[in-house]
Regions:
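Extreme N-terminal starter segment of soluble prokaryotic enzymes
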Residues: 1-3
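Extended catalytic core of nucleotide-activated donor transferases of GT-like folds
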Residues: 6-7, 15, 19-28, 32, ...
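Catalytic binding pocket for nucleotide-activated donors in carbohydrate/polymer assembly enzymes
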Residues: 7-11, 21-24, 39-46, 50-57, ...
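Short, solvent-exposed loop/turn segments at secondary-structure junctions
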Residues: 9-12, 42-46, 89-91, 116-118, ...
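Anion (oxyanion) recognition and catalysis
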Residues: 30, 104, 156-157, 210, ...
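Hydrophobic anchor at the start of a short beta-strand
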Residues: 34-37, 110, 162-163, 216-218, ...
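Conserved catalytic-core segment of nucleotide-activated headgroup transferases in glycan assembly
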Residues: 171-254, 264
């Protein structure tokens, strides 16, 4: 079965938090027999910051950010059995969605894969004229990066034929325990780009604890922080490529996950970083959000902080022995229940069920 997948980038994680999600899922789907072509625009300098080579489990087509190139790649949707348009591609998303739907065969399954569902739904609720309201009627299936029942209910209320969350997970071939790297040694590390809808939470959950714990060392990775005034005990690394994620996660005493505003408000939205860190055997501290216990057990496999004061207290009292035990427990859990192999099995079942239903309807 052929999949045409239109997304932000498979080759680069630069300003592209969905990269490892796409890689893990599509690699696992390829192992289940899918023939996949991923179409990504050359925008935001991502091609200058590639952190993987073109994979052997998926063809990648990089296109210029022009209307002509967009229409050319959209025409390729006609060759696919499953046509996926992801949210947040980064170049003319609305035009691309309409173009791929126009070019998809009548017998193809059309999918809108929302990697930012809480934010998308908020925009739809606040803008009755948003074009996606009408376009949803043309889409066979909505898959989401997470969000649980609240996202499913909202999408169905807006007219989606079907909506299923496909959560982030672990690819143990790329994210796994490694030897510590002294360059990442610290008491607490946070990896995340500077985003308008997360910065206040980063201030509260990372920078404020750093100021309180002035004698401890904090490490910041991610793009966009260059002009941010930092506490003296915070070191900024800039963009940290995928190849360095394991060492970044496993070396500090603990690593921190901070959700974006919309993800925290909605809940049920574990970030890729959660599973990447757990897969490396890291001790992970996360901001509190609804549903965390469905993925990792608080206090045993993950530490949950309600605010910056909680983060400071956790870091102050956390011993290396306990940190290692929490990381080991998290690793066992994600290997057993949260791999992309398991997520791909769910996606495969959904796709096959769709085509089986269609075949039965045609036979009636």
């Amino acid at each position: 079965m052929k999949i045409a997948f239109y997304g932000s980038s498979l080759l680069s994680s630069y300003w592209n938090g969905a990269a490892t999600y796409y890689r893990g899922l599509l690699k696992a789907l390829s192992k289940r027999g899918y023939d996949i072509v991923f179409y990504e625009p050359d925008v935001y300098d991502r091609q200058k910051h590639r952190d993987i080579k073109a994979p052997d489990w998926c063809s990648v087509v990089v296109y210029e950010p022009t209307a002509h190139a967009l229409m050319q790649v959209a025409s390729c949707a006609a060759q696919a059995d499953v046509v996926v348009k992801a949210s947040g591609v980064g170049f003319e998303d609305e035009a691309l969605l309409h173009a791929v739907l126009d070019n998809a065969r009548p017998d193809a399954l059309t999918v809108f894969w929302d990697v930012d569902a809480p934010a998308t739904l908020s925009e739809l609720r606040n803008h009755a004229e948003h074009p996606l309201h009408e376009t949803l009627k043309r889409i066979g299936l909505v898959l989401t990066y997470g969000g649980g029942d609240p996202v499913v209910w909202d999408y169905r209320a807006l007219g989606a034929a079907e909506c299923v969350p496909i959560y982030n997970a672990l690819d143990p071939e790329t994210h796994h325990p490694v030897a510590a790297n002294p360059g990442f040694a610290c008491d607490l590390a946070f990896l995340g780009n500077r985003l308008p809808d997360r910065e206040a939470r980063v201030d509260a959950f990372f920078f404020d604890p750093a100021r309180v714990l002035g004698s401890q060392r904090f490490l910041l990775g991610g793009s966009g922080w260059g002009d941010k005034p930092l506490p003296a005990n915070v070191s900024w690394l800039g963009h940290v490529g995928t190849r360095d994620h394991n060492a970044f996660n496993v070396t500090p005493k603990a690593v921190l996950n901070i959700s974006r505003d919309s993800m925290a408000a909605n809940g049920f939205s574990p970030a890729t970083r959660v599973f990447e860190a757990a897969g490396a055997g890291a001790c992970l501290i996360t901001d509190a959000w609804l549903g965390v216990e469905l993925f990792l057990t608080p206090g045993e496999e993950i530490l949950v902080a309600r605010d910056g004061a909680d983060v400071a207290e956790i870091v102050r009292t956390l011993t290396p022995t306990r940190a290692k035990a929490i990381g080991a427990a998290a690793l066992r859990r994600v290997l057993a229940e949260h791999t992309y192999t398991l997520r791909a099995r769910l996606v495969d079942d959904i796709f096959k069920a769709h085509f089986e239903r269609r075949a039965m309807e045609a036979a009636e």
